[in-house]
Regions:
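Sequence context surrounding c-type heme c attachment/ligation sites in exported
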Residues: 18-93, 466-596, 600-604, 608-610, ...
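Extracytoplasmic/secreted envelope proteins and their assembly/folding machinery
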Residues: 30, 67, 71, 92, ...
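Short amphipathic alpha-helical segments at helix boundaries and their inter-helical linkers
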Residues: 258-275, 335-360, 449-453, 661-670
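Soluble non-cytosolic domains of exported or imported proteins
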Residues: 23, 27, 86-90, 226-234, ...
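Extended surface/linker regions that mediate inter-domain or inter-protein docking
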Residues: 95-98, 111-112, 121-231, 239, ...
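Aromatic- and Gly/Pro-enriched helix-to-coil junctions and flexible linker segments
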Residues: 16-222, 241-242, 246-262, 266, ...
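Bacterial N-terminal signal peptides
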Residues: 4-15
């Protein structure tokens, strides 16, 4: 009887909690919709085929998707349109609070659009003017976090534990798409991912105790005679040093010792040894980056990462394995202060080698930022009279990028405007001669036609890099590798190219393509692609978004989808004019450009573009989007970049020695 009574009370409480707050709807939300929304979204007008007239306040009763869309548009500032009457912040906040509360009552996963703010493609929704406006009293860092290892770290470190074992399963996924891959919020370990990792751990454990294994203290655990308690303890210490990278605590030593003893009683000491190593290999500290912080919170409620946490954070920011230099510095007490960290990062970044491989994550930033390696994934037939080799194009472009990183001056501006590119040339290690510039392939003709070089053009190392005529090439965005990566199989893709400029250089936002939209451009050989695109995007409901992308992307109609410079398209002179607009930056807005070279020249001079570039570098190295609490970090990084004449090393040093990187909110503050 008591149980039935309690159950009835619980149902009543839940029902009360789930009831729609209709009073607040009629008092706050309905007048808001009437004032700011219904002029365009009533039953008669229905802009975007959306009517909010008579919408029910019952979010869970058939209106979930519509309310979720309204919340998203209001939350991200996309509605009302900028030229329409705007609600004040208090009005917007009140309506958002009501919708948020009703969405939460549905208990539907992903009901809140604000969850998207942790995803890399939504970083630009943080107000740029506020980030680079008035500085704050202090940095408010992210909460403590467990950051699942990216596949490259796992694939580099795990095989070494098993004496370079092969055949390990891939249990760690990476997100698809053109955004940064290693975002902490994007990954977790579930049962499906843990199963192959457990299989890997068993294989590695067996290899660590195999007869040909090097470590005697681990092999002692599987010899004929059962090990003594001290031998088990020594095996645990060795396993922790090799696998976790530290000595076990007293609690861990006792716990794993008891585990081995229980496993031995059940299956014998050999099986127990493998189970012991498998358990250590599956510890969260092995599969996650631990960034919890230590010590007493400061006056702002922040705690600093421990020296060991800093060492691993720096290692994985610049490399795909623990860097001995950072681990030693932590052990020697030389990562205790911000100045210590800055000095260590500065020393590590001093890489003047041709390949620029001391810190592979630096080059990887530019791969992921520009996304040019994707050219390898875009299938194309060979052009008439030419050759399309996307892998060669990517390698050629990376030779230029390596040069720019080694020079480390005006890095962004140079990458956006350079006319000097390599053609069939890359840095290679030559036996007994070291790294030298060598041909990518010996049988390369007529590969050079991708760069509009004549079929009889004479190739030579002494002619590298090739300086192209002014107006023909201008930076990475006019290189065939980037153009091919941001194209279709048979045509250019000015929409995606324009979106890249809007988001990666101008810091703007573009909504997702609405469900049900047919985004195909009609085929018509006698009409230029620019005009064919205009036919399908000119409608008002389409142009609202396409005006942010198309005027920026159509300048690249100067090139065909292979990346070759062209003067005619569909038998007509190419129109490569464009417009930089809707940026909120007076010196850029309304700027008409004659083609890609002029656009790149304008963008490369912009302080705003530099700041957006800094924001992307922040996301890459921090593994998260920036918040207003990171204002000081971003401004300091931009200052470092400018004062160093555009040094990416100085920018990286500033980020990795910042409070945003080294500090975490204390658990209490994070909870509050």
């Amino acid at each position: 009887m008591m149980l039935r009574c309690c159950f009835s009370i619980l149902i009543g409480v839940l029902s009360a909690q789930a009831a729609v707050d209709e009073a607040a709807f009629w008092k706050t939300v309905e007048p808001f919709l009437d004032t700011y929304c219904l002029k365009c979204h009533d039953n008669e007008t229905q802009k975007g085929k959306l009517s909010l007239e008579g919408i029910s306040p019952s979010v869970a009763d058939g209106n979930l998707e519509m309310w979720r869309m309204v919340f998203e548009r209001l939350h991200f500032g996309e509605m009302p349109p900028k030229k329409k009457k705007q609600p004040n912040p208090a009005e917007r906040a009140a309506v958002l609070a009501w919708i948020r509360g009703e969405l939460l009552k549905t208990q539907e996963p992903g009901a809140l659009a604000e969850e998207k703010l942790t995803e890399p493609q939504f970083g630009n929704y943080v107000d740029h003017t506020a980030l680079f406006g008035k500085r704050r009293s202090h940095v408010t860092p992210a909460p403590p976090r467990l950051w699942r290892l990216r596949p490259a770290i796992y694939n580099t470190t795990m095989p070494r534990l098993g004496e370079r074992i092969t055949g390990l399963a891939n249990g760690l996924n990476a997100v698809d798409g053109s955004d940064f891959k290693d975002f902490a919020a994007a990954y977790f370990l579930d049962e499906a991912a843990a199963a192959p990792l457990l299989g890997n751990a068993k294989k590695i454990a067996a290899a660590m105790t195999a007869p040909n294994a090097k470590d005697r203290s681990l092999k002692t655990l599987v010899v004929d005679a059962p090990p003594t308690a001290e031998q088990v303890a020594e095996g645990i210490r060795t396993a922790f040093r090799k696998i976790v990278g530290r000595a076990p605590t007293a609690e861990e030593l006792g716990r794993f010792g008891a585990f081995h003893q229980a496993a031995s009683a059940t299956g014998g000491h050999v099986a127990a040894a493998n189970a012991l190593l498998t358990a250590i290999l599956m510890q969260p500290e092995v599969l996650y980056r631990m960034e919890l912080g230590t010590g007493e919170p400061d006056e702002h409620g922040r705690v600093r990462l421990s020296p060991r946490e800093v060492a691993y954070a720096l290692s994985y920011a610049l490399d795909d394995r623990p860097v001995e230099m950072f681990l030693k510095a932590a052990a020697d007490g030389k990562l205790a202060t911000t100045e210590d960290v800055a000095a260590a990062v500065r020393e590590r970044l001093a890489d003047d080698t041709l390949l620029q491989e001391l810190n592979p994550r630096v080059l990887q930033f530019f791969r992921e930022y520009f996304h040019y390696p994707f050219a390898r994934e875009v299938f194309k037939d060979a052009p008439k009279g030419g050759k399309h080799e996307p892998d060669w194009l990517v390698r050629d472009l990376e030779t230029t990028v390596r040069d720019v990183l080694r020079a480390d001056k005006a890095v962004l501006s140079t990458l956006l405007t350079t006319r000097r590119f390599y053609v069939n040339a890359q840095y290679k290690s030559v036996k007994r001669k070291g790294v030298q510039l060598q041909p990518t392939h010996t049988k390369w003709w007529p590969y050079q036609t991708a760069f509009n070089l004549a079929p009889d053009w004479r190739w030579g190392l002494d002619r590298q890099p090739v300086e192209f005529p002014e107006g023909e090439r201008a930076g990475v965005l006019t290189h065939p590798a980037w153009l091919a990566a941001w194209s279709g199989n048979f045509d250019n893709h000015p929409v995606q190219r324009g979106k890249w400029i809007r988001t990666h250089l101008l810091g703007g936002t573009v909504p997702d393509v609405p469900i049900g939209v047919d985004a195909r451009v009609p085929d018509a050989e006698h009409i230029t692609f620019r005009n064919r695109l205009k036919q399908v995007t000119a409608a008002a409901e389409c142009w609202r978004c396409h005006r942010k992308m198309d005027p920026l992307g159509v300048v690249f109609e100067r090139y065909d989808h292979y990346g070759r410079y062209q003067r005619r398209d569909a038998g007509q002179p190419v129109d490569a004019t464009g417009l930089i607009d809707r940026t909120g930056v007076p010196e850029l807005d309304g700027k008409h450009v004659s083609g890609p070279a002029e656009m790149m020249a304008e963008l490369s001079k912009s302080t705003h573009v530099e700041q957006v570039f800094v924001r992307h570098a922040f996301r890459y190295f921090m593994g998260r989007n920036e918040t207003l609490g990171d204002t000081n970090t971003l401004q300091a990084a931009h200052d470092a970049y400018r004062k160093s004449s555009g040094s990416f090393r100085a920018l990286t040093e500033s980020l990795l020695a910042s409070d945003s990187f080294l500090m975490r909110q204390s658990p209490k503050q994070a909870k509050d």
